[in-house]
Design a protein with these regions (language model features):
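Hydrophobic core segments of transmembrane alpha-helices in multi-pass, intramembrane catalytic enzymes
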Residues: 58-62, 140, 193-201
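Hydrophobic alpha-helical transmembrane segments
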Residues: 9-14, 52-53, 91-96, 135-139, ...
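Structural signal for membrane-spanning alpha-helices in multi-pass inner-membrane proteins
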Residues: 66-70, 105-109, 141, 179, ...
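Membrane-interfacial alpha-helical segments at the cytosolic side of multi-pass membrane proteins
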Residues: 154-165, 227-232
């Protein structure tokens, strides 16, 4: 134990292990619980209940792995992952900026005749509502998911890649790119939007030193998306 962060290559490798480890355990658990056959694996992409459960399970496993990995450096997990409370001024200002940044592309999409609510969002919302899992889906999307993703991308990965103020934008860009690639269920336009928002979240992480701040901001973005889905569903 050296009290030094993992190297960049090790950080990337360990981060991927945590990410896919969590997803793998979630998949195996759901297959075991529900006896999903190969023919029904696609249900994991459209069934709101299964998506909700997978978020809970994957986040729990991924976070546990990240904590274990950080402890191997001899540094406390909270310190390593940037889990510090943000300043009130930073929270208010960044929340305002992120709210505008999240709403502007969706408004532009509607202006040009595109629906910002994807079929994936609509399908999981509809099925979760039908199965009585809607409150748990809201919690998964607005709270649990952002906590897991930010702990990985703006927490663990950012710490491993950010070594000095000079390489801040390298860390910000790398984490934003990886975060965007993790949203492969969306089209290229939305993935690009995720990347830009990732740059913004990374900047706030760098300036504030707080991953809790980016968790809250990520939650705001996902809340906007869920509200848009709610409106679209009730208009359908």
């Amino acid at each position: 134990m050296t009290n030094e962060p993992w190297g960049r290559s090790a950080t990337l490798g360990l981060g991927l292990i945590a990410l896919f480890g969590g997803q793998g355990v979630a998949l195996a658990t759901l297959v075991g619980w529900y006896g999903l056959s190969m023919a029904h694996w696609s249900d994991l992409l459209v069934d709101g209940r299964l998506v909700t459960l997978s978020v809970y399970i994957a986040t729990a496993v991924q976070t546990a792995l990240l904590v274990l990995m950080t402890l191997r450096t001899g540094t406390g997990a909270a310190s390593y992952l940037g889990l510090a409370l943000p300043r009130v001024r930073d929270l208010i200002l960044s929340a305002l900026i992120v709210t505008i940044a999240g709403a502007a592309p969706d408004g532009a999409s509607r202006l040009f005749g595109f629906n910002p609510v994807t079929q994936f969002q609509f399908d999981i919302y509809r099925s979760a509502r039908t199965e009585g899992w809607l409150p748990w889906l809201w919690l998964a999307i607005v709270v649990v998911g952002p906590t897991g993703e930010e702990t990985l991308f703006r927490g663990f990965l950012f710490r491993g890649w950010h070594r000095s103020p000079r390489d801040a934008w390298i860390a910000i860009t790398v984490t934003a790119s990886l975060w965007a690639l993790s949203h492969a269920q969306y089209n290229l336009y939305l993935i690009s939007q995720v990347f830009v928002l990732g740059l913004l979240l990374g900047w706030f992480r760098f300036k504030s030193g707080s991953t809790i701040l980016t968790i809250l901001l990520h939650g705001v973005l996902n809340l906007e998306a869920m509200l848009e889905t709610f409106v679209a569903f009730n208009r359908a």
